[in-house]
Curated annotation (Swiss-Prot):
It comes from Streptococcus agalactiae serotype V (strain ATCC BAA-611 / 2603 V/R). This is N-acylneuraminate cytidylyltransferase. InterPro entries: CMP-NeuNAc_synthase (IPR050793), Cytidylyl_trans (IPR003329), Nucleotide-diphossugar_trans (IPR029044), SGNH_hydro (IPR013830), SGNH_hydro_sf (IPR036514). It is found in: Cytoplasm. Its EC number is 2.7.7.43. It catalyses: an N-acylneuraminate + CTP = a CMP-N-acyl-beta-neuraminate + diphosphate. The gene is neuA. Gene3D superfamilies: SGNH hydrolase, Spore Coat Polysaccharide Biosynthesis Protein SpsA, Chain A. Signal peptide: none annotated. One of its GO terms (cellular component) is cytoplasm. Belongs to the CMP-NeuNAc synthase family.
């Protein structure tokens, strides 16, 4: 018997109206859960059910090719519980029917979380599997307040307090609930002594209940650079198309740091935020037979996006091979250090730069170490950066002159 998936989506949220359908990263929030269920590969589409009281929700959710069940009016009130809804929904199924409840308010849960949790449930003798996350703030630091406003339960709480000595505590994060009809209806709960806690990391466990929660999730998705790169594929493709110059014989391949760079006789294909990986995907589309030289300064966005150092090595090799096959001479710069940036560290940049130095030496590729001009004590100079990653105008002017000297010197060799 195949498992079924149930996604509750009542329309009457008062704290955050229509929270289940609010647009999040380009699609209704409920679609993040529907898509995760589909992509898990654990259900037939017809066995993924949205339970709702809204005809509008129904109409939109059907666009995903799944099933929608309209709730009875008495199951659509604030007083109706999840148990009430599930008891009614499961009434026509066999007692051994396995089901998965996915709450819309956990939009960061991934398809592989669902798959892993279901595989554990199927292969172990447990009553239920429920997703849990570690508590960030330990309850030993929680307190009630007296009528006068005193923290009466906290007396001496900081004496010898060491977070690392406290036993980790976990809470159900609301993302995944797995059981079967007989067990759940008998216990009227997903929590028994035989409920297995499927652990999920904090970054996947955000729960949307209030507007602040929703803004938090928006911020999380905005700063998920891997998702951003995927979503921006078309944007970058169109950008290269707009920049296309069939007559260009010398080109600049870079990111936001070289957008303003102007080298004599060079056409600039730089785009802000682009990775070496994305640039490589698009390069054949604008690499004409006229191109003879390429000035390349790129790579830090690959680290920010989450590419490994080894993947970046490989992509630089692919770039060199592609240019060499087309008899295009390559001029390269190192990657500039950063300063106090959470998304990238200079140890990785140094590894890549050391590799580039050796690679360029072996293949006789001219290499300009821009950190000679920009760094201080192994970091990007504070006075030459606007945000720890990008350059000030002073730094751009300095690099402009150094880049021109570099290509001019190479020209005379």
């Amino acid at each position: 018997m195949k498992p079924i998936c149930i996604i509750p989506a009542r329309s009457g949220s008062k704290g955050l109206p229509d929270k289940n359908m609010l647009f999040l990263s380009g699609k209704p929030m409920i679609f993040h859960t529907i898509d995760a269920a589909i992509e898990s590969g654990m259900f037939d589409k017809k066995d993924i059910f949205v339970s709702t009281d809204s005809e509008l929700y129904r109409e939109i959710c059907l666009e995903r090719g799944i099933s929608v069940v309209m709730r009875k009016p008495e199951l659509s009130t604030d007083q109706a519980t999840s148990y009430d809804m599930l008891k009614d929904f499961l009434s026509d199924y066999e007692d051994n029917q396995e089901f998965v409840l996915l709450q819309v308010t956990s939009p960061l849960r991934k398809s592989w979380h669902i798959k892993e949790a279901m595989e554990y449930y199927s292969s172990h003798d447990v009553d239920n599997v429920v997703s849990f996350s570690e508590v960030e703030k330990h309850p030993s630091l929680f307190t009630t307040l007296s009528d006068e406003g005193y923290a009466i339960d906290m007396v001496g709480a900081d004496k010898g307090y060491r977070r690392q000595d406290l036993q980790p505590l976990y809470y159900p994060n609301g993302a995944i609930f797995i059981s079967n009809k007989e067990t759940y209806l008998r216990e009227k709960s997903f929590f028994t002594s035989r409920t297995y806690a499927y652990q999920m990391a904090k970054e996947f466990s955000l729960d949307v209940d209030t507007r602040d929660d929703f803004i938090h999730v928006i911020g999380h998705l905005f700063f998920d650079y891997a998702i951003r790169e995927k979503e921006n594929k078309v944007f970058y493709k169109e950008g290269y198309s707009r920049l296309f110059n069939r007559e260009a014989s010398k080109i600049i391949l870079g990111d936001s740091k070289t957008i303003s760079t102007s080298l004599e006789s060079y056409h600039n294909y730089s785009q802000g935020g682009v990775t070496l990986a994305t640039m490589l995907e698009n390069l054949p589309n604008f690499l004409t037979a006229n191109v003879t030289e390429a000035f390349v300064s790129i790579g830090v966005n690959d680290l920010i996006t989450g590419y490994s150092v080894e993947e970046i090595f490989s992509n630089f090799q692919k770039l060199y091979s592609l240019l060499a096959e087309n008899k295009i001479k390559m001029r390269l710069t190192t990657i500039a250090y950063t300063l106090f940036r959470e998304t990238v560290n200079n140890a990785d940049i140094e590894k890549i730069n050391q590799w580039l130095t050796e690679f360029c030496y072996q293949n006789q590729i001219p290499l300009l170490d821009i950190n000679r001009f920009l760094s201080k004590d192994g970091n990007l100079n504070y006075h030459l950066t606007s945000d720890g990653l990008h350059f000030t105008q002073e730094a751009n002017d300095l690099l402009q002159s150094q880049y021109q000297l570099f290509v001019d010197e190479v020209k005379t060799l």
